[in-house]
């Protein structure tokens, strides 16, 4: 089986755009540093094309065996595609056990099908950093920070609960200490006076306003009768004969004597109209001189 079976065709559209962006992130200077490191450890020449020299997985397996002996038990030197893929898979498993994080490791197709050489380079750099952390002399990558584990006694852990963290703010400066619910009466007093308890109920706090100036003292509900009198007269309460201002006036025109609208009303003048006399028993009922009413209906 030829290797052409595993090669992909040219990419178009979005796939080509993604492939170009990944290719732009490839660092050729890092490639030269990795080449010198791998060739120095394994003693084998990679070739002019760096990725093609690693494609069969033979150099990679020998390289991890140098860093960690016994990592790959068998290295396939066959030219068959599945043997080369098997070498790459064994290398990936070996560097995972060596300590490289899974998110830093490339996939087999990234190298074998030339789909993402940038990820392959990132994996080799992560392997160099892990080797430097374990004490190998490597000029590539960075050394990982060592874990600084601390063990605390249970008493120390319980004491930490009394500490206010920075995320909870501070207990200095202005605070809401002593604040009550909205609308609740609050007593204001001077602590310099030495009074531990608030003042009595006769004290008006600042939140309740002031007892000076205009106020609503003596005000009643709207529409309620209010007695108006002069305090100089010595009368605490006015009698019922006084008409308050809220009740109007008893002078001028009024509706006194008015009847319901539409009822007949008898109008007569007592100077000209005699007092009506009602007949006694036995007298005739018709007496035109005794009744002088005019119906104004």
Swiss-Prot record:
Residue ranges occupied by any Calponin-homology (CH) domain in the UniProt entry: 28-131
GO BP term (any one): actin filament organization
Annotated TM spans: none
Xref: InterPro entries: Calponin-like (IPR050606), Calponin/LIMCH1 (IPR001997), Calponin_repeat (IPR000557), CH_dom (IPR001715), CH_dom_sf (IPR036872), SM22_calponin (IPR003096)
Any one annotated GO CC term: actin cytoskeleton
Keyword Phosphoprotein attached: yes
SUPFAM superfamilies given in the database record: Calponin-homology domain, CH-domain
Keywords: Actin-binding, Calmodulin-binding, Phosphoprotein, Repeat
Name this polypeptide is given: Calponin-1
Modified residues (Phosphothreonine): 170, 180, 184, 259
Subunit structure: Part of cGMP kinase signaling complex at least composed of ACTA2/alpha-actin, CNN1/calponin H1, PLN/phospholamban, PRKG1 and ITPR1.
Modified residues (Phosphoserine): 175
An MF annotation (GO) of this entry: actin filament binding
Calponin-like repeats by residue range: 164-189, 204-229, 243-268
Domain of life: Eukaryota
Family assignment from sequence similarity: Belongs to the calponin family.
Pfam families named among the record's database cross-references: Calponin, CH
Protein role: Thin filament-associated protein that is implicated in the regulation and modulation of smooth muscle contraction. It is capable of binding to actin, calmodulin and tropomyosin. The interaction of calponin with actin inhibits the actomyosin Mg-ATPase activity.
């Amino acid at each position: 089986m030829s290797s052409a079976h595993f090669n992909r065709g040219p990419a178009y559209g979005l796939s080509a755009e993604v492939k170009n962006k990944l290719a732009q992130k490839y660092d050729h200077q890092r490639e030269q540093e990795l080449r010198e490191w791998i060739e120095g450890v394994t003693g084998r020449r990679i070739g002019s094309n760096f990725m093609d020299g690693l494609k069969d997985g033979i150099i990679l397996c020998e390289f991890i065996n140098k860093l960690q002996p016994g990592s790959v038990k068998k290295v396939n030197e066959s030219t068959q595609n599945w043997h080369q893929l098997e070498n790459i898979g064994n290398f990936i498993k070996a560097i995972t056990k060596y300590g490289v994080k899974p998110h830093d490791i490339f996939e087999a197709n990234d190298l074998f099908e030339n789909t993402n050489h940038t990820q392959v380079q990132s994996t080799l750099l992560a392997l160099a950093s892990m080797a430097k952390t374990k004490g190998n002399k490597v000029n590539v990558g960075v050394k990982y920070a060592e874990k600084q584990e601390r063990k605390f006694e249970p008493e120390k852990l319980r004491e930490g609960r009394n500490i206010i963290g920075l995320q909870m703010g501070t207990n200095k400066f202005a605070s809401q200490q002593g604040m009550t619910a909205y609308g609740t009466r609050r007593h204001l007093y001077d602590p310099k006076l030495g009074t531990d308890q608030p003042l009595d109920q006769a004290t008006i706090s600042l939140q309740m306003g002031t007892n000076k100036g205009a106020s609503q003292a003596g005000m009643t509900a709207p529409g309620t009768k209010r007695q108006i009198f002069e305090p100089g007269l010595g009368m605490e309460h006015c009698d019922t004969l006084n008409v308050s201002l809220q009740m109007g006036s008893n002078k001028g025109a009024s509706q006194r004597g008015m009847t319901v609208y539409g009822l007949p009303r008898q109008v007569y003048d007592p100077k000209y109209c005699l007092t009506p006399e009602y007949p006694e028993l036995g007298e005739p009922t018709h007496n035109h001189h005794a009744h002088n009413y005019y119906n104004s209906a």
